[in-house]
Amino acid sequence: MEELQGYLEKDKSWQQHLLYPLLFQEYIYALAHDHSLSGSIFYEPVEVFGYDKKSSLALVKRLNTRIYQQNFLISSVNGSNQKRLVGXNNFFXSLFXSQMIIESFAIFXEILFLRALVSFFGEKKVLKYPNLPSIHSIFPFLEXKLPHLNYVSDILIPHPIHMXILVQILQCWIQDVPFLHSLRFFLHEYHNWNSLLITHKKSICLFSKENKRLFRFLYNSYVSEFEFLLVFFRKQSSYLRLRSSGTFLERTHFYGKIEHFQIXHFAFYSSMSXLFPVVXLKXPFMHYVRYQGKALLASKGTHLVMKKWKYHFVTLWQYYFHFWSQLYRIRINXLSNYSFYFLGYLSSVLINFSAVRNQMLENSFLIDIITKKFDSIIPVILLIESLSKAQFCTVSGHPISKPIWADLSDSDILDRFGWICRNLSHYHSGSSKKQDLYRIKYILRLSCARTLARKHKSTVRTFLRRLGPGLLEEFFTEEERVLSLIFPKTISFILHGSHKERIWYLDIIRMNDLVNYSXLX
C-alpha cells in the first residue's frame, strides 16, 4: 500500500495512466493479501464455473503473462457476427481469464478511489466517528430531524439503461483512454457471454454471481456523481437564483468551473436554458439520507419547493445521465399523514395532542400542546413474506419445518435458527412495537422445533416434552440479556415495559437479507 501511495504521489498524472501499474507494476499484486487494505474495502471473493481459485490480483498477473506469451485471437463463435475473446481454443478458459481481469479492474479502481477519499478527508481534517458506518446511525438522525419537518420525498434512484453510461461517468475521474476502452470491451464481452450461456442453467447460475464487485463499483460511482451534483446545486441555489445551470451538464470541465466559479464561465445555451432553472430552491432545513437505491429528501419548505426538486431530479437523470425516469419513483407526501419504508422499518411521524391547564391567580385556562415523535415499527406482513420465501413458514405465517436442514446435527440446527433469530432481534430492536418482533421469533422457534422433530421422526409436542422447554430458551432471552447489561439498575422496570423500549445498536454495518430494501420498495 505504501508503494502504491508513493506511485500516486510521484506521478500526479495517475488518472491518465491508470492501466500501467495494473499491468506492469509487480507490487500491485501483493495488495490482494494486504490485511490493512482488506479492512477498508469490502472484498467478497467469488467462485467461477466451479474453480476453487478465488479472484486474486496475483492470478491476474499470471493471466497477463499468458496473454503476452500466447496468441489470443478475436474470432467469431457459432458463426455469429459477434466477436468474442477466445484463447488457446478454450472458450471457458478465456471467459475465466476475462472475468478475473474485470474483477481486478474493480479492485484497483477501489484502491485509487479509497486513496483519493483518504487524502480528501486528511486535507479537510474531518473528525472520525467510529459509529458512523453503522446503518442504525441513520435512525437517531431521523429521530432528531424529521419531527421538525413538513414534507418528505420518497425516492427510488433509477438504474442506468446501458452500462456505457456508467463508464462515461468515470471519465471525469479517469482520463486513461486504454483503461476505459478495456473496460468497455470486457463489459461488451460480458453481455455476449451472458447471451451465449442463457441456455445452460447451471452455467448461468454460476455466471450470475460474477462481477458483483465491478458492477457495485460502477453503480456507486453513478450514485456518487448524482449526489455530488445534488449537493452542488443545493449549495449554489442562492447564487444561481436567476441563472440557468444547464451548462453544468458539460461534465468534462465541471470541476474547473467549481474551482473558478465566475460569471464569465456561464455560456448560456438556448436549448438548455429552460431545463435547469434553479429558482426558489433555497429551502430551509433540507435533509437527505440514502441507503443503496432508496433515498429520502425531507424539508421544512412548502409542497411547491418539493415539486421543483422532483422536477430537477427527473431532468438531471434525463439530460445528464441520458435515461428516462418515471415520475412514480419520486413520491412527495406530508409527514403528518404518511408512512414510508426505509431500511426494513415502516417509519412515520406521530402527532400527539394534549391539553395543559394553567392557572394564574384566580384565572385558569387550557393550553393545547402538539408534540411530534418519530416512530418506527416492523412491517410484519412483508417480513413474514420474506420468511415464507426462505421456507420458515407459510404465506399466512404458519411455522413449517425446513427440510434442507434436517440432515444437520442438532447443534447446527439450533445455531442456525438462533443466529437468524438473534440477528433479526438485534436489527429490529428499534421498533416501538415489540409484540410484532415476538411474533417473528415465535415463528422461528416453532420452525426450529418442527425441523428437529422431523429429523428425529417425532412430533413437536413429544420432542419438547422429552428435551424440555429450555432447549429453545435463547429465542426469547437474548433481548432481555442485552437490556440487563445496558440498564442494570432499572432492570425490573425495563423488562416490565421492554415492549416499548427502543434501542439503536451502532455496530450494524449491513442489513439482514430477509429485510433488504428491494423487498419493501
UniProtKB/Swiss-Prot annotation:
One annotated GO molecular function: RNA binding
Please verify whether the record's keywords include Cell inner membrane: no
Q: Which organism is it from?
A: Anthericum liliago (St-Bernard's lily)
**Domain of life per record:** Eukaryota
- UniProt keyword Membrane present: no
UniProt cross-references to InterPro entries, sorted A to Z: Domain_X (IPR024937), Maturase_MatK (IPR002866), Maturase_MatK_N (IPR024942)
PANTHER family, per this entry? Answer: MATURASE K (PTHR34811:SF1)
For this UniProt record, give its keywords in alphabetical order, as a comma-separated list: Chloroplast, mRNA processing, Plastid, RNA-binding, tRNA processing
Alphabetical GO CC annotations of the entry are:
chloroplast
Q: What is this protein called?
A: Maturase K
Provide the gene name from the record: matK
Specify one Pfam family: MatK_N
Where is this protein localized, as stated in its record? Plastid, Chloroplast
- What does it do? Usually encoded in the trnK tRNA gene intron. Probably assists in splicing its own and other chloroplast group II introns.
The family note in this entry says:
Belongs to the intron maturase 2 family. MatK subfamily.
Please list the GO biological process terms of this entry: mRNA processing; RNA splicing; tRNA processing
